Amino acid sequence: EKKPSGTTSFDPLPAAQKIDELLNAHLKSENLKPNPLISDGLFLRRIYLSIIGRIPTILEANNFLNSNSKNKHSELIQKLLSNDAGYTAHHYQFWADLLRIPTNVDYTLYYREWIKSQIRNNTPYDDLVHQLVSGHGLIFDNPAAAYYLRDAGMALDNMSNSVRIFLGTRLECAQCHDHPFDKWTQMDYFKMAAYTYDFDVRMGVAKNSNRQRVYQDFGKRKNAAYKKEAGFEDFPHIHDESKIDEWLGQPYAPGYLERNNLTKEQFREAAVRAIAARKKVEEFDNPVSQSVNMLYGHISNVQVKHHDDKPLKLPHDYQYDNGAPEEIVKPGTMFGPEIPHLEDQTERKNAYANWLTSPENPRFTRVIVNRLWKRAFGHGIFEPVDNLTDRTEINQPALLRFLENLMQELDYDIRDFQNVLFHTELFRREMHLEDHSPGMKFHFAGPLLKRMSAEQIWDSITTLILPNVDTYAPNRKRTQERIARTKAIYQS
């Protein structure tokens, strides 16, 4: 069982000192010197922005700057990591961007609150990812299933995104052909996608449901009123009066008028009557239609399920010798241990999640430590963080190996891992202020200068205005009410 967040039992200093030793040895080998240490004031601002995403209040600043404790830097780090509200709010932005969580649909309310609870409870990273990629069922019962709702109707794209996010590997090109710049083949792509391709999302309700019959009845009523007032069963559909002359200007209009013995003026009068009749029905039905949409809109995305009759097939134009067009693809891993063939979809998905998050997976740990390193210091040990290939040049391999081992020794405890990074001398060094071009080696004499995020700027401004800014959540009650309403609507 994981220790509670904000624990003081973990000593980050030995690992932090080892990181500094590796960095200093590398700098020495390059005839470089580390940047000078920053002042307490700069450290104060940097650590607040890094851990809880805002500047300190005047009281918080004075408490730190006036402290005579020899360990005040470490004590402040521990205090901020123990600030569940501030830590969760700031780190949620990181995960929301990474997981591409939308904010404009109701189903994500459950998902967003669940992600925040995982951050707050310090769920191990491997456990969090396992829950996400193995998730299925109703989001009320298993909010992690909403990870697949993000790519509703795009099962192939979901696999590309998962591999990029969690393994730092770009497979998009291999969806259509063998990757031109990496070793992945189109068959590799489809074998990976076969693990999760059979998932689907319950988008609303069935075609023969009461809801659909209501919409069908609305449509029939409008069409009947339109045709009755026009006086012709085959009277053309014209949306509004401004389109009448446009229709009369079409090459097929004279033939229609002649067949029905109509002049242009008679046609125009019939169209005006028909449009008015349809609008009258719409005015009566629209409030009901809107009420139905309001009711069902809340539950249009609430479930991830498996299909028994949805095997993944190669494209109709598959051109390589290792398969035939429209051949059914069996799942297979792109690297690392093979997964035994499993017929049961849930077991197969769990086995895929086990493979993805395994310490034996050569990229799972490497990618997350590099992402967190870049978040702390402005530049990854390798770049880009989500385009790792066999040809990727890693400037400090010993440092990367140490960080991977550290993450595994910490059982993927994200707070403890960041605790180590924030205790390094590197974190307290002056930033690298010069332009750094992509592709150039970065030696970490100090962190790379980076701009504040929009959220950091906003939260820093509100810090100057609001008391208890970390716990200020005026919309929380409304959010919880919306969640409860959505669940009640579905269960009804």
What are these regions (language model features)?
Residues 11-45, 50-51, 55-86, 100-491:
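Primarily short, surface-exposed interaction patches in extracytoplasmic proteins
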